Structure formats: structure tokens, C-alpha cells
């Protein structure tokens, strides 16, 4: 099986511009880039598809370029957005880019020029605006740009001229790296297709040469929602933002209908093994979820942390909640208490288990909250400093555990 056949069989390929892509990546002759706009100080589980694809292609001899969007982040990509992104300072962007690099090195080998990490701020921030309009802007049709899917959602609610330039900036990135780094291919999410075509067309019109693009399937659940978030919050690769235990639990708790797709797309397990696992049913699906969670946690946090997270999760599910060393935790202070105690509703909000007292109240009334294995009988229940000093474990629903101590 060729490399392209494998990534196709894993469901990673959405669409390609030309069949030449197949020969290039199969023969290790692709120098390709994927862009990362550094809008936060950590990558998320949503970046997994891109990171694992870069690793697969590098293992086959292709050369990845991880492009940090230090310049484009100052504009903000409107793709898939209904609002304008928050503007970041140069200092914020530089800090976020440094964090990205540290995390990417767990997936990609940057030694001896096997991969490059570039920052488009190095060329975009020095561009002369008039020259850009004349040399690059003349290659773009406003009519075609307005028909692009990446702008479609924003047209009714308002698209700033700043954001309208994003396609030109991303296209210029490809054009620049084609000239200076021999980059002949761009990969990205399926929602980036219009922007990527802009780059291939710019190279063709300015240089008379061919460049290629391939979009990666978006990681969505069985309901079509993007994966990589839990309770509305991103699942981060930074252990200080999402602990290895929380990260493990996110993947351990994927639905039965999503687990095999995630294993196929995200892990490096052989396809033959995955095909055999696809026949598993009922309780064996839980085993598949453990395999998924362990493999991905190992990839991001290392085998030792993955084993700790798995052992902690197994202990919790077996009822041994006292073994809670690696679960999410909240440390209270005396200032959090009122007259030496704290109510369950306030406690749940402080622990991030509910967005408000009202939500916490509903969970308690519905019988969905346990403390140290005992169902919380009423929303008026409170806990003393003495109880909290020993530590308590709150269980929300069937799968969410949180340790609270004073």
C-alpha cells in the first residue's frame, strides 16, 4: 500500500487539486506546508489531524514546513467564523508562536533540516502596501473572492476589509515559500480550500509553474460537530491547560459511533489491526476507547503520563475514587469559605463543573452529582473546612470526576 493509499484509507484526504500530488508524496518529493495561526498559547486537539499528517508524510521522506502565522494572525482568518477574531499584539503572537514550536517538536523532527518552522511575519510585516496591490492584488478577482466559501458566512453579518485581505496574505505565503524554500504543496482543513486555490493560482500566474493543494478532512463527531472541545472548552495540548488525565478522559469518553473513526484517523496503529477492531461491539468498544485515549495521550504527553492517566481512570471507574492523584483538581483557600463552609452549588462553579449556580442546582436536583460516592441529596448541602482538608471527589454525571481540597 502506498502512502497516499494509506492516508486515503484512513479518511484523511478531503480533496486534491491534481493527481500529481499522489506521485510527489509517494516518492518523498513533496515539500509541503501547513499554516497555524497562533491565536492562543497552545495547540488543541483540533490540530491533531494536521500534526499527525505532517508526521506520516515526514516518515515517508517528505519535508514539512510548519508555518507559524505571526503575520496572518494580525489579520485573523474569517473561515468558519460568524464574528471578527480578537486582535492580538505582536508580543502575544511571538509568545504563542514559541509555545507552538515546543509542542510541534513532539510530532515533527526539525533536526538537520528535515523540517522547517517558519513565521510569515518575517515577510508579511515588511511588505509595501502599494507594491502588494500592484504585484499581487492584480492577480485576484473580487468577484471570485466574494463567491469563496470562506467569506460566505460573513457577508450578511459584515466582513471587514482587514479580514477580506486574508486570502491574499495566505496566497502570498505559498508564493513566497515556493520561491524561497521550494515548497510545492499546501495542506489544510477543508474549510481552507478557497484560500489554498488562491495560492496555487497566484504561483501559476506570477511564475508560470504548478503548485498543489490538498485539504484534510475535518475531525467531526457523528453529529457533524468539530471535535476537540469539552463542555465548550478547548482540549489543549499544554498539560497546564488540560491535564494529561483530562486529555485522556476526553478521548476515553468519545461516543461508540466515533471511536473507530478517531483510531483510524489519528493513531499510527496498523490498518490491519484497526480493521479487526472495527468488528468489536458492546464492551469491547470500551477497550477500543482505552486504546485510543492511551495512544493519543502517549503521543502528546509521553508513555509515563499516559499510563498514569489510564490507571487513574480505571481506578475511578472501578469505584476506587481515593486514587485521585492525576484527576483534575481545585485547591480552595479559607477565603473561599463562608463561616467555615461552602455550598455545593458554589463549589461546583469554582471547580468548573457548572457555569452558574442555576446549572449546578439543576444537576443536583436531577441526581447527577455525587461526592465521595454518595449522591448529593439537596442543593443546600455544604462542606466544612475539616471535610475539605481531607479532599473530596465530586462526580458529575457518569464520567466527569473532580477533586477539591483545602
Description of each model-found segment:
Residues 1-32:
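Positively charged, low-complexity intrinsically disordered leader regions
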Residues 7, 44, 117:
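Divalent metal-coordination and catalytic microenvironments
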Residues 21-78, 186-193:
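N-terminal catalytic cores of NTP/NDP-binding nucleotidyl/phosphoryl-transfer enzymes
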Residues 50-57, 177, 195-203, 296, ...:
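Buried hydrophobic packing segments
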Residues 76-80, 127-133, 225-231:
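Short acidic, glycine/serine/threonine-rich loops at helix termini
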Residues 78-94:
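A charged helix-plus-loop insertion that forms the helical arch/lid used to bind
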Residues 203-406:
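Conserved nucleotide- and phosphate/pyrophosphate-binding catalytic cores
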Amino acid at each position: 500500500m502506498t502512502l497516499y493509499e494509506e492516508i486515503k484509507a484512513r479518511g484523511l484526504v478531503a480533496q486534491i487539486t491534481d493527481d500529481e500530488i499522489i506521485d510527489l508524496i509517494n516518492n518523498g518529493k513533496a515539500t509541503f506546508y501547513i499554516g497555524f495561526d497562533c491565536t492562543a498559547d497552545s495547540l488543541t486537539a483540533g490540530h491533531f489531524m494536521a500534526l499527525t499528517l505532517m508526521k506520516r508524510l515526514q516518515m515517508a521522506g517528505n519535508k514539512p514546513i510548519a508555518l507559524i502565522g505571526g503575520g496572518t494572525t494580525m489579520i485573523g482568518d474569517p473561515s468558519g467564523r460568524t464574528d471578527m477574531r480578537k486582535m492580538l499584539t505582536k508580543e502575544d503572537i511571538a509568545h504563542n508562536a514559541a509555545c507552538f514550536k515546543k509542542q510541534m517538536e513532539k510530532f515533527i523532527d526539525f533536526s538537520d533540516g528535515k523540517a522547517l518552522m517558519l513565521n510569515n511575519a518575517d515577510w508579511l510585516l515588511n511588505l509595501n502596501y502599494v507594491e502588494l496591490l500592484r504585484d499581487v492584488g492584480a492577480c485576484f478577482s473580487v468577484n471570485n473572492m466574494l463567491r469563496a466559501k470562506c467569506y460566505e458566512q460573513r457577508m450578511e453579518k459584515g466582513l471587514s476589509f482587514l479580514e477580506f485581505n486574508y486570502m491574499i496574505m495566505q496566497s502570498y505565503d505559498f508564493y513566497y515559500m515556493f520561491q524561497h524554500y521550494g515548497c510545492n504543496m499546501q495542506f489544510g482543513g477543508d474549510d481552507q480550500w478557497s484560500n489554498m486555490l488562491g495560492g496555487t493560482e497566484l504561483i501559476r500566474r506570477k511564475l508560470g509553474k504548478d503548485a498543489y493543494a490538498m485539504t484534510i478532512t475535518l475531525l467531526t463527531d457523528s453529529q457533524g460537530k468539530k471535535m476537540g472541545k469539552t463542555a465548550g472548552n478547548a482540549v489543549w495540548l499544554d498539560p497546564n491547560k488540560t491535564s494529561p488525565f483530562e486529555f485522556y478522559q476526553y478521548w476515553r469518553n468519545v461516543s461508540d459511533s466515533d471511536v473507530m473513526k478517531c483510531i483510524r484517523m489519528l493513531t499510527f496503529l496498523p490498518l490491519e489491526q484497526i480493521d479487526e477492531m472495527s468488528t468489536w461491539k458492546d464492551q469491547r468498544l470500551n477497550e477500543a476507547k482505552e486504546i485510543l485515549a492511551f495512544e493519543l495521550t502517549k503521543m502528546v504527553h509521553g508513555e509515563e503520563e499516559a499510563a498514569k492517566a489510564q490507571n487513574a481512570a480505571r481506578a475511578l471507574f472501578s469505584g476506587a475514587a481515593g486514587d485521585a492523584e492525576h484527576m483534575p483538581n481545585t485547591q480552595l483557600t479559607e477565603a473561599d469559605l463562608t463561616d467555615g463552609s461552602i455550598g455545593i452549588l458554589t463549589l461546583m462553579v469554582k471547580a468548573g463543573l457548572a457555569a452558574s449556580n442555576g446549572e449546578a442546582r439543576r444537576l443536583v436536583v436531577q441526581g447527577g452529582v455525587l461526592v465521595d460516592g454518595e449522591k448529593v441529596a439537596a442543593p443546600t448541602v455544604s462542606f466544612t473546612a475539616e471535610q475539605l482538608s481531607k479532599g473530596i471527589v465530586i462526580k458529575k454525571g457518569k464520567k466527569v470526576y473532580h477533586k477539591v481540597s483545602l
